[in-house]
Amino acid sequence: MTKITVFGMGSFGTALANVLAENGHDVLMWGKNQDAVDELNTCHTNKKYLKYAKLDVNIIATSDMTKAIQFADIYLMALPTKAMREVASQINDKLTSKKTFIHVAKGIENGTFKRVSEMIEDSISPEYNAGIGVLSGPSHAEEVVVKQPTTVAASSKDKSVSKLTQDLFMNDYLRVYTNDDLIGVELGGALKNIIAVASGIVAGIGYGDNAKAALMTRGLAEISRLGEKLGADPMTFLGLGGIGDLIVTCTSTHSRNFTLGYKLGQGESMDQALSEMNMVVEGIYTTKSVYHLAKEKNVDMPITNALYRVLFENISVKECVKDLMERDKKSE
């Protein structure tokens, strides 16, 4: 039995906390919202994010950062990318011993263009860092929490962290593979959110299967181009952390990125769509980061560029689709 602190009480953090508890581990969840903490401790639910799920009664929650830090030597960082650096820094200020960090965020930091493991590494003093890894792949929280068969990848620069992650999470409904390509697994998880928003737009407009298939295929091509430029193994993008995550996020209404895109395709403004969803949509922030990163690295990413124009330059969806279709002739 292992003690694990889960930082973040969103949908995926909650679903994975449930997996860990059912696997026999001691789990403490940390969140800022006292009402959510009280609900979990009293009712064993988190209805804001997982409306109908009844959680393992052994999961406990707290809003006390010091208590959360002292509880365990393994931390599951289940926070939005934009909150990761701040919370990791707060954790670092209170650490007195080495900890292992496993994150499940799928984004690229605005401004620095850093992957989430790099953000954590920046924030945690070396004397307190026992290793950093990621758990990623096609894994909707809504399915994990009701024990639908799910398969994901665990990766780290340190193979022992990947193996630890595999051992902690794997059971008869969650299969975990290890993968040595941390860069590729993190980039696959982050970049597919861009394509998922675009895929939602295509569905919202009412375009057919031809357009959806083309978008995912060409989206994977530009993900691979940038990934290879940044040091990833292109083969990673043909695995769970790449095309696996891409397919599930581009085809399901469980995906908040797809849902945002669908609403935009239906003619809603971004503010209107986000107000209805009341959830963090990583694809917005990732699009901004990757648009500028691709320009800096001189990588051609036409779908990302088009989505950036829709999200941040108020260009119409149909105009961007027209521009994509009328680009110069190219070889695949």
Curated annotation (Swiss-Prot):
Its EC number is 1.1.1.94. One of its GO terms (cellular component) is cytosol. Its main location: cytoplasm. NADPH binds at S11, F12, K32, K106, A141, R256, V280, E282. GO terms for biological process: carbohydrate metabolic process; glycerol-3-phosphate biosynthetic process; glycerol-3-phosphate catabolic process; glycerol-3-phosphate metabolic process; glycerophospholipid metabolic process; phospholipid biosynthetic process. Keywords: Cytoplasm, Lipid biosynthesis, Lipid metabolism, NAD, NADP, Nucleotide-binding, Oxidoreductase, Phospholipid biosynthesis, Phospholipid metabolism. It is found in: Cytoplasm. The active site is at K192. Sn-glycerol 3-phosphate binds at K106, G137, S139, K192, D245, S255, R256, N257. It catalyses: sn-glycerol 3-phosphate + NAD(+) = dihydroxyacetone phosphate + NADH + H(+); sn-glycerol 3-phosphate + NADP(+) = dihydroxyacetone phosphate + NADPH + H(+). One of its GO terms (molecular function) is NAD binding. Pathway: Membrane lipid metabolism; glycerophospholipid metabolism. Disulfide bonds: none annotated. NCBIfam families: PRK00094.1-2 (NF000940), PRK00094.1-3 (NF000941), PRK00094.1-4 (NF000942). Catalyzes the reduction of the glycolytic intermediate dihydroxyacetone phosphate (DHAP) to sn-glycerol 3-phosphate (G3P), the key precursor for phospholipid synthesis. Belongs to the NAD-dependent glycerol-3-phosphate dehydrogenase family. This is Glycerol-3-phosphate dehydrogenase [NAD(P)+]. It comes from Staphylococcus aureus (strain NCTC 8325 / PS 47). The gene is gpsA.
